[in-house]
Amino acid sequence: MKVFSAVLIILFVCSMIIGINAVRIPVSCKHSGQCLKPCKDAGMRFGKCMNGKCDCTPK
């Protein structure tokens, strides 16, 4: 059980670090599939739609 808790904490910290590096680009969207190409064109690796704008995560 202690190992499981430690793994959860590590995953939580890693997800926060990745989320901090997200960059919002001025592209409107309705779903995350619309953000893939604009984020790749901006030099980012991943993209998702949040509050109607694309949030991109760097490589």
From Swiss-Prot:
Domain of life (superkingdom): Eukaryota
Assigned keywords, A-Z: Calcium-activated potassium channel impairing toxin, Disulfide bond, Ion channel impairing toxin, Neurotoxin, Potassium channel impairing toxin, Secreted, Signal, Toxin
Name the UniProt record assigns to this protein: Potassium channel toxin alpha-KTx 3.5
Gene3D superfamilies: Knottin, scorpion toxin-like
Entry annotated with the keyword Ubl conjugation: no
Family: Belongs to the short scorpion toxin superfamily. Potassium channel inhibitor family. Alpha-KTx 03 subfamily.
Signal peptide: 1-22
Annotated source species: Androctonus australis
Lineage start: Eukaryota, Metazoa, Ecdysozoa, Arthropoda, Chelicerata
Cited function: Has also been shown to inhibit with high potency Kv1.3/KCNA3 and with low potency Kv1.1/KCNA1 and Kv1.2/KCNA2 voltage-gated potassium channels. Also binds and inhibits the molluscan calcium-activated potassium channels KCa (Kd=135 nM).
Main location: secreted
Region (Interaction with Ca(2+)-activated K(+) channels): 47-54
UniProt GO molecular function: ion channel inhibitor activity; potassium channel regulator activity; toxin activity
Disulfide bonds: 29-49, 35-54, 39-56
